[in-house]
Amino acid sequence: MANRNPGCGAFCTRRQFLLAATGTAVAVTAPYFATARQRDASEDSDRILADAESRIRQHRMAPVTLKLVTPDGQPLGPGRRVEIRQVRHRFLFGCNIFMLGRCRTPEQNAAYESRFAGIFNYATLPFYWWNYERQKGSPDHERTEEIVRWCRAHDVTTKGHPLAWNYRDPPWLTGTPQEVARAQFERITRYVQRLRGDIDIWDVVNEATHYDRAECKRDAPRLTEAIAAMGVGPYIRTAFKTARQAGRDATLVINDYRTDAAFAEKVISELADEHARPMYDVIGIQSHMHGGPWGAARTWEVCERFAKFAKPLHFTETTLVSGPKSESGWTTTAKGEEQQARLASEFYTVLFSHPAVEAITWWDFSDQGAWQMAPAGFLRDDMSAKPIYERLCDMIKGRWWTRVEAESGPEGRLRIDGFQGEYEAAVKENGRRLGGRFSLAKATAEATDVQLTELSADR
């Protein structure tokens, strides 16, 4: 069947949808109305951005009164200068980590690692079935465990992507549609159980809205036929039920590139149990913008559309490129890098200001090995930092980061307002340097005890 139109009806391809979603394919037959729409969107974007910082303060910060307790159980004396330092965001700022240890040189690997750890607290690990298990029964768990160890050492939360996706069949996968579906669900059980405690956030089903697009039928005929035989609703419900049984405390994500009503109506609304309770924990929204930026107005509109489901939103795959595609290739440019930094800072500002959003994952960290060979990274091909890296560092670890000095009052109390996350407090008392940790969230008790212990000389 022919595709309907670039405005993305039910039969639009993934590529057409992404192009249409960026707003780059305006109707050339109606320039006046296109211009009017663009003008309205621009005005909306200006308003959304102008109000963003106040929303960020409202939704991302929290007040708390700390009661500092010394190692001998007594309140810290009044008038002590206390350093309060944030060490981790509650919000998940992340990226896929596919190139960890796989860059061309040891020096590039070191740069990749240090810069990743310098900005992100969240990493997406690859679980593409056709690549992860090239031979039946021989999954690449060794690679996963290597990445998990690195993430644990750098206090980076991990996510697996994806457990089920009919993008390409594993070469060895055979059988009836029922047997193929059974193999898929058994994979979910094995991986979630094996990696429990190492990876507890999962993209369970990826891109189910348009599972039967042409490239899926061509490259994943067996998996696609299995979904068709079951029906989309029963398939995704079985996948999520299987994942929940394997990991009771896991965070389960339904992920898609469709940001229109089709995702909401065809997939999310179908993903409920017999008691009409959602079977998912998070709605995952892809935001690849290879063809151009969404703009603040569209970004906010997407957030509002999916916030109505009353579940956290994760922007799971975000891309803005730093150079135009040409016949000679796709490379980064100085002008493109500045534009990428500006557009990314606006995109992150809008998302961080929306109360439903809890995570943003960039796709990919460096231009080396990037999807579509696009200049999409925070780092160039040689692992040097682009302006986007510095700009986002200034935001994530600067403007949206809390570090203050305060004076203790009676009973060792002091009050701060800070961005939600993990904190360290440090103070000198009777010649000793004392420190303690605490968490700050909207739900944090109004008065929170911080138990201080003596710090070593190097801290």
Residue ranges: model-predicted function:
Residues G421-G431:
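A short, solvent-exposed beta-strand micro-motif common in secreted/extracellular proteins
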Residues Y122-Q135, E145-A250:
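Substrate-binding cleft and catalytic face of glycoside hydrolase catalytic domains
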Residues T13-A21:
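N-terminal export leaders
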Residues Q108-G118, R415-E422:
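Short Pro-Gly-centered beta-turn/loop motif in secreted/extracellular proteins
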